[in-house]
């Protein structure tokens, strides 16, 4: 069938060239195939239609220069060879091809080879070709079609690779020149770039980021100058909370907004609160570390009526000496059996050191080493404090004059057999 069609086309082409020398007036009228205003549908093309079309084509070529008349046969072959039917329905049968080609006969453009000129490109004719003509077309011819119209058409058809087109059996893609919306193979969503790549993605309203300030960059922290900081600190010393009127005045003075001043004062109050809290925590820690030594409050004050007293005679005596003169230490209350044991003692350590004899008389300086030796090993606290029970010979060895024979308490505390007062010189009052 294909061979027969080729032979028929060649015979018709010869007829057209022979009749091109004497154009007839019957073909000077507009052919119904070119009538784009009417809505009549052209039926399937017959053999006579093809012959009349080629005759009409030759008559149109006769209107141009003599160069076109000499090469009329060549132009006729090119025009038939390079025109594609854009509305084929993927069938190789000639009957289906004729039926489908009539649907998109109107509103089409001429696609010719590079050998033609611009004046010939402006002419229009229906797209009528056959499968054999399309298969003979090479890749270079397809690229030249796009260049003939100023590069408006890409080499690939609707973004589909040429390899994919060649692998499809029994199908032929539509020409890029055909833009009729009634075409069956036309896809409005097909990309215009080769390889199926989009030139630019479409933008829709739902693709925008939600939010009034979505396009704005987040504002950074406000940097205050030294002058602004000093003025704000000065104002904070007088008023920790600003009124609206004063805040407006500061905003005009310091070239800041009211919101910036308000935030600065909030941060400053929070900073002050943290500083006060830190000072309180330090004071609590110091209170827990302080014991009897260096304390303003004597730990013996809480033990006035405690059962630790040997004779239960109160807090005057050794505890007063320990709290005042020594300033702490082991504050267990010890005293003699008689009240006279406390007469020579006082809460002031200095007075005790001056009046150790209990009678107001002077006393010699006690040797420090001998004092420690005499009171280091004491059988009991009571014997240490009560001079009546002590051995007078041992006391005299320490060069201490006991005028009235009263207790020999010299301002030291013997706790658990060890002296707690060291390095003290006892001079006369």
Curated annotation (Swiss-Prot):
InterPro entries: Antp_homeobox, HD, HD_metazoa, Homeobox_CS, Homeodomain-like_sf. Residues 124-143 have a biased composition (Basic and acidic residues). The keyword Aminoacyl-tRNA synthetase does not apply. GO terms for molecular function: DNA-binding transcription factor activity, RNA polymerase II-specific; RNA polymerase II cis-regulatory region sequence-specific DNA binding. The keyword Ligase does not apply. Pfam families: Homeodomain (PF00046). Restricted to the posterior 16 midbody segments. Expressed in the dorsoventral muscles, which arise from the septal mesoderm and lie in the groove of the intercaecal constrictions. Its main location: nucleus. It comes from the Eukaryota. Belongs to the Antp homeobox family. Sequence-specific transcription factor which is part of a developmental regulatory system that provides cells with specific positional identities on the anterior-posterior axis. May play a role in midgut regionalization. This is Homeobox protein LOX2. It comes from Helobdella robusta (Californian leech). The lineage of its organism: Eukaryota, Metazoa, Spiralia, Lophotrochozoa, Annelida. The gene is LOX2.
